[in-house]
């Protein structure tokens, strides 16, 4: 809608076609495999990183227990996944550390040197990892991993914007969580609040987060900024992103 040609880095072209109905160019790659990234970076001026995995062990972690780990052995294996951090890292290929820390660092390293903006979707709670409920969310290190991803971006020398949304709601419903099951929506009734210092909490519409990503691409007030985004208050007829970004320090 804003006139940007879009290239989607994906492990599944079918998924991209299903979500975007062939309106974007799909390039196969995997941030966990840095050798797959350079072909996707040719001619890229702006990069939006919206990758992630589940905060808690799930099928999306691609857990691989030792061969023959059925029955009681499987139960023991899952017990170790839940309680032994080293074992967990060794036997899961898509956990937060691999995706949100190492994967983001791989993407940073592959980004063109003349990139105009690197936008990263992180999470509220990065600076509140020891406070409930973020301590529970971070039980398996997702906030630590996202923080490491943020640091890789900040230390890269690339111009960046880091957005820390609240709990994501609205479609597309691709996550395996309670919100997906109930398909919660803002239904356009709540406004957008942004803040700094990791003080905000609440829900954030995926639609509004996506709009913020696009709005900040060429906005100088959002360059090299980190901010939280949640939905709260009454919603104006039209969101004024210039006004919102102007409040950033």
Each PLM stretch: what is its role?
Residues 8-112:
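NAD(P)H-binding glycine-rich loop region in Rossmannoid oxidoreductase-like domains
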């Amino acid at each position: 809608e804003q006139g940007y040609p879009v290239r989607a880095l994906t492990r599944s072209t079918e998924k991209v076609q299903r979500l975007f109905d062939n309106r974007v160019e799909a390039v196969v790659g995997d941030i966990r495999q840095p050798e797959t990234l350079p072909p996707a970076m040719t001619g890229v001026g702006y990069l939006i990183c919206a990758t992630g995995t589940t905060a808690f062990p799930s099928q999306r972690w691609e857990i691989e227990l030792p061969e023959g780990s059925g029955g009681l052995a499987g139960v023991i294996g899952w017990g170790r996944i839940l309680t032994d951090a080293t074992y967990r890292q060794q036997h899961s290929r898509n956990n937060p550390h691999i995706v949100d820390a190492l994967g983001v660092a791989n993407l940073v390293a592959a980004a063109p040197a003349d990139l105009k903006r690197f936008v990263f979707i992180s999470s509220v709670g990065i600076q509140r990892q020891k406070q409930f409920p973020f301590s529970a969310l971070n039980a398996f290190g997702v906030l630590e991993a996202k923080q490491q991803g943020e640091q890789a971006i900040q230390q890269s020398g690339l111009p960046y914007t880091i957005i820390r949304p609240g709990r994501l709601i609205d479609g597309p419903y691709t996550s395996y969580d309670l919100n997906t099951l109930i398909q919660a929506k803002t239904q356009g009734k709540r406004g957008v609040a942004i803040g700094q210092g990791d003080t905000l909490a609440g829900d954030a519409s995926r639609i509004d987060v996506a709009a913020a990503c696009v709005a900040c691409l060429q906005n100088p007030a959002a360059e090299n900024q980190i901010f939280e985004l949640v939905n709260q208050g009454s919603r104006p007829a039209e969101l004024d992103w210039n006004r919102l970004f102007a409040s950033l320090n």
